[in-house]
Amino acid sequence: MKYNTHTLDNGLRIIHLPSDSKVVYCGYQINAGTRNEEPGEEGLAHFCEHVTFKGTERRKAWHILNCLESVGGDLNAYTNKEGTVYYSAILKEHIARAVDLLSDIVFHSVYPQAEIDKEVEVICDEIESYNDSPAELIYDEFENILFKGSSLGHNILGTAEQVRSFTTEDALRFTRKLYRPDNAIFFAYGDIDFKKLVKLVGRALADDDSGKLAEEDCHADFSGGTGFAGDENSITTEKSVSSVKSVGPKNYPSVGEEIAGQTIVMQKNTHQAHVMIGTRAYDVNDDRRMPLYLLNNILGGPGMNAKLNLALREHNGLVYTVESTMVAYGDTGTWSIYFGCDEHDIKRCLRLVRKELDRMMEKPLSASQLKAAKKQIKGQIGVACDNRENFALDFGKSFLHYGWEKNVDCLYEQVEAITSQQIQDVARELFDKDRLITLIFK
């Protein structure tokens, strides 16, 4: 894959992957997530994402909403623990419009208090909707247990009380500190001329470096080792660059002896019990991450033939949903299993889960099992990469935080290099019953 890259004088990195599509996916990935919030600011990163659409020095809220919609485009944003993303999907003939709008809202929003007062209620409704979904809420509560006392521990949305306290001044303080060109990247995936793109972005940011694009900047063929950033569906090539910013302080605590191996029950008065089992795992740079990637897919990946799905759903009819998940942050990670079941089936489900974990710890995969697992995950990767929007968002995220660019062929090579012994070693380390924490909502 041939990526085009260029860095403006103001520090903004631009990355572009050509495609034959008439649709361009582009936007800003900013190193400003919930990990960057100070105590008392919980929910501020997500709040800023919402109110960034509410007016700039040049545009009112209505003009922002209508700018791309009027030509059939899409404007969207999201916040996670390590970043905030503003992006668009637009026909390539409207790329100048998208670049100008995105640059305007990211770097020139004024956050009018009158608009904030309205949007706060929208955010609070989002919080209430989330609180009504225990299958989602349990993931945040689980991370709060794993990373209690750190910025990774609190959820992205914050509380309604906290959100209602935020003002224009709070949004300006947070974004002026973090929404900077040298703390962001602009990504684009589509059939557009890269030199033109650099000039458009430079002009939108009034950067006089935009006309100094050298020919050698236009053709960077990155083909290093492979990996994935963030979660098990993110795919990238590992190639470090010196300008990569830290994703956050290493302020997470170790899982304490008081909770390691323990079961924590929370009364939520739900119709169904919700259960998570897991532990802290590997960061995005850890060599054990790829064996865990494959192991996780074997156990609880999206395939109906995943071991946990067969054990709990297909063979015993105990659950509708069971899945395992891994998340790799810049300096730590998580691995967990989730399932929902009737309350009286909790113990039986836990025994079946433990049985599958013990099997992975005690017996290495046979050569045929390993070959089948690799074939399956490579197929899933190929299908996932066909989603152009997700592909664009992922390579932008990877380049911002880790200096890696997607290279699916290299990822396939690294999948092929995984051994049964590596998988068993990871299973023995992570699946130790004295290490795992169990959280139950009922």
Model regions and ranges:
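Short, Gly/Pro- and small/polar-rich lid/capping loops
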Residues: 1-10
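Charge-rich, well-structured scaffold segments of protease-associated domains
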Residues: 7, 64-219, 225, 231, ...
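Active/ligand-binding-proximal structured segments within catalytic/core domains
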Residues: 11, 18-68, 179, 287-299, ...
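Residues located in well-ordered beta-strands
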Residues: 13-15, 414
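Short, conserved beta-strand segments within well-ordered enzyme catalytic domains
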Residues: 15, 25-29, 52, 76-78, ...
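His/Glu-based metal-binding/catalytic segments typifying zinc-dependent metallopeptidases
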Residues: 18-20, 27-29, 248-305
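Solvent-exposed coil/turn segments that connect beta secondary-structure elements
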Residues: 19, 33, 56, 91, ...
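Histidine-centered active-site/metal-ligand motif
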Residues: 46, 50, 274, 315
